[in-house]
Amino acid sequence: MNKDDDKEGLAMFSALIDGIKPITQNKRHFRTPIKTKQEIELKEQQLHANSYFSDTYQPLLPVQGPMRWLEEGVDSLELKRLRRGDYQPDLLLDLHGYRQSEAKLELAALIQACVKQQSLCCCIMHGYGSGILKQQVPMWLVQHPMVKAFHQAPKEWGGDAALLVLIDIGEQPHRR
C-alpha cells in the first residue's frame, strides 16, 4: 500500500458516510450508580482509621513490664481488672498476617463494632512476629477517643501476644 491508495480509500470512506447523522438517545435514561451500605461503611472506616491513627505520634508507654495504658480520668482499678482478666472480651481481632494499613482499618472497625454492639471489652491479638504490629497497635489505641484503657492480656487470652482493650460505650452500666 502506498500513499495514493490510502488517499483513495479515505475518499471512498468519506463518500460513504457523508450525510450520516448520529442517533439521538431518547429511550434510555442512565442513572448514577447508588452506593451500597457496605461501600459507605467501608469509606467511613477508612476515614476514621486515617483521622484517628497517626504513625508519627509517639505516646509515653511503658518500656519494661507488661504493655498497659490508662486514659486520664479513668479509675486505676479498671486497669487492675483488665490485668486480672475480670473483663471477658466480647469481640476478638486477630491481626496475624496483616499489613499496617490493613490493621488500622480492622482496628477502627473493631472499635466501631464494640460501640455499636455495646461491648465493653475486646481482645486484639497482634502476635509476636517481627514486632511491628506489637509496637504500633498500642500507639494507635492511645490515639482513639473511645479507648479507655488497655493491658497485656492474661495467658488464656494470648498473653504478651495480645491486648485486652476497655472501650467507652457511653453511659451504660459496666458489665462483667
Swiss-Prot record:
Gene Ontology molecular-function annotations: RNA endonuclease activity; rRNA binding
GO terms (BP aspect): rescue of stalled ribosome
rRNA-binding as UniProt keyword: yes
Listed EC numbers: 3.1.-.-
Smr domain boundaries: 93-168
Keyword Lipid metabolism on entry: no
Top-level EC class: hydrolase
Entry superkingdom: Bacteria
Keywords: Endonuclease, Hydrolase, Nuclease, RNA-binding, rRNA-binding
Complex formation: Associates with collided ribosomes, but not with correctly translating polysomes.
Family designation: Belongs to the SmrB family.
Function text: Acts as a ribosome collision sensor. Detects stalled/collided disomes (pairs of ribosomes where the leading ribosome is stalled and a second ribosome has collided with it) and endonucleolytically cleaves mRNA at the 5' boundary of the stalled ribosome. Stalled/collided disomes form a new interface (primarily via the 30S subunits) that binds SmrB. Cleaved mRNA becomes available for tmRNA ligation, leading to ribosomal subunit dissociation and rescue of stalled ribosomes.
Identification of the protein by name: Ribosome rescue factor SmrB
Gene name, Swiss-Prot/TrEMBL: smrB
